[in-house]
């Protein structure tokens, strides 16, 4: 089957909605066990990792994380691949911005490394075509049989978009290494029907009065902060949709109401609870569409928050109210009555920052040390600042007060991801 036919087949096969959890479980069960049989027979690492555990008991498989995967990548893959050659090609592509070289039918790319170490993703033409069909089903503003011009603002181009493009669907790549004012002129000339970009790019286009009228806007590759979502939505007069993707897979996408739902038609997402009462968890991903680089019982460091109640769109796929960030984004402040540290999740920091002044347009918050938090604000001359949000937070969490250092916030969209809240200080050192 050609790439384009496979993309169309996957588009048509992707359920628009699931009516019940029972339907989702039936859909997943057969596909997961079939996939695990394939992986066990073709991956030396997983065959050893699962030794003594039956395929049907896959929920008992030991977890995998990025470190374990990267340390065992050659034996984890289900295809023979010269990793040194693959890495050379991927590194060269990032420098030359020519992403066409591959190893056979395999494309190789690096993650952005926001978690501290860079991962690698390896996909075949078949997987890429399947992925494209799935994402078109979840993201197009209309039918695949209509005319579309999809603009993609990416840190690295993909070999696959050109292959699945057609007379009806055109893909345009906008390289984030270029200056943003140049990219804005280019996208205005293109005037795409669908715009997929990091929220920092969407925010830049909104702030600079970009003259385009897309039917659908999709935020991807960065956490969409409420302050950015509001401004982007108001400027373009529409719901800001989201693709929540990572090196480990396409984890969630929004429904027509703009609510994130886990992509449970292509993966099972288990939960390692951080705070079950409030719905915070680390996702444990079993992707039954990834064959070359299998992702099975893979624990992510991201923090997701379950949406309370059932989404009004009627889709039974698990709804997510927020992608809160990574474990690296959790602040740790010393308790008043001991030498132990209290974790403070990003949402609490965000709320305290937003109470500083109602005129805040953009911000960042970085924990620099055990006792210091840097807060960047835009505009930079806001006055007065109300610190009561932080004072209440320190009191409620029973932690020692941290020094709040106010600086100017400045971020120009580029290949570096925007992270509004994160921790530079290692509380374990």
Regions found by a protein language model. Give the residues of each.
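Nucleotide 5′-phosphate-binding alpha/beta core
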Residues: 1-110, 116-130, 137-141, 156, ...
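Active-site phosphate/ATP/adenylate-binding loop shared across adenylate-forming ligases
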Residues: 1-15, 71-218, 223-235, 259, ...
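Short acidic, glycine/serine/threonine-rich loops at helix termini
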Residues: 162-165, 253-256, 417
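A generic "binding-loop/recognition-motif" signal
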Residues: 201, 246-247, 327
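General small-molecule cofactor/ligand-binding pocket signal
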Residues: 172-175, 241-243, 270, 402-407
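Conserved AMP-binding/adenylate-forming
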Residues: 230-311
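AMP-binding/adenylate-forming catalytic core of the ANL superfamily
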Residues: 195, 292, 298-398
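Short, well-ordered coil loops that connect the C-terminus of an alpha-helix to the N-terminus
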Residues: 117, 237-238, 246, 359, ...
């Amino acid at each position: 089957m050609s790439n384009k036919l496979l993309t169309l087949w996957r588009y048509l096969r992707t359920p628009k909605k699931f009516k019940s959890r029972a339907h989702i479980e039936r859909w997943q069960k057969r596909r997961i066990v079939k996939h695990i049989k394939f992986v066990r027979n073709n991956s030396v690492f997983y065959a050893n990792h699962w030794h003594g555990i039956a395929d049907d008991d896959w929920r008992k498989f030991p977890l995998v994380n990025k470190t374990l995967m990267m340390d065992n990548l050659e034996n984890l893959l289900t295809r023979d691949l010269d990793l040194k050659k693959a890495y050379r090609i991927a590194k060269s592509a990032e420098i030359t911005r020519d992403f066409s070289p591959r190893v056979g039918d395999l494309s190789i790319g690096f993650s952005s490394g926001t978690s501290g170490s860079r991962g690698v993703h390896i996909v075949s033409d078949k997987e890429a075509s399947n992925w494209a069909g799935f994402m078109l089903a979840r993201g197009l503003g209309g039918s695949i049989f209509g005319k579309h011009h999809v603009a993609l603002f990416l840190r690295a181009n993909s070999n696959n978009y050109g292959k699945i493009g057609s007379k009806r669907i055109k893909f345009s790549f906008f390289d984030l290494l270029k200056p943003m004012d140049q990219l804005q002129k280019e996208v205005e000339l293109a005037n795409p029907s669908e715009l997929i970009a990091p929220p920092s790019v969407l925010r830049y286009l909104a702030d600079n009065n970009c003259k385009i009228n897309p039917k659908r806007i999709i935020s991807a590759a960065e956490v969409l902060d409420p302050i950015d979502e509001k401004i982007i939505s108001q400027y373009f007069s529409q719901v800001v949709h989201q693709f929540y993707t990572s090196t480990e897979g396409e984890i969630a996408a929004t429904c027509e109401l703009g609510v994130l739902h886990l992509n449970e038609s292509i993966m099972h997402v288990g939960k390692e609870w951080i705070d079950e009462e409030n719905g915070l968890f680390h996702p444990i991903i079993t992707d039954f569409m990834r064959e070359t680089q299998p992702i099975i019982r893979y624990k992510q460091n991201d923090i997701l928050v379950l949406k309370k109640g059932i989404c009004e769109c009627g889709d039974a796929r698990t709804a997510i109210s927020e992608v809160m960030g990574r474990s690296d984004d959790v602040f740790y402040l010393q308790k008043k009555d001991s030498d132990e540290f209290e974790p403070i999740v990003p949402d609490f920091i965000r709320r305290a920052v937003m109470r500083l002044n109602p005129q805040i347009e953009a911000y960042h918050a970085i924990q620099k040390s055990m006792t210091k938090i840097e807060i960047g604000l835009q505009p930079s001359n806001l006055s007065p600042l109300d610190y009561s949000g932080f004072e209440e937070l320190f009191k409620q969490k029973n932690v020692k007060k941290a020094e709040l250092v106010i600086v100017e916030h400045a971020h120009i969209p580029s290949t570096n991801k925007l992270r509004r809240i994160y921790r530079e200080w290692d509380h374990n050192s």
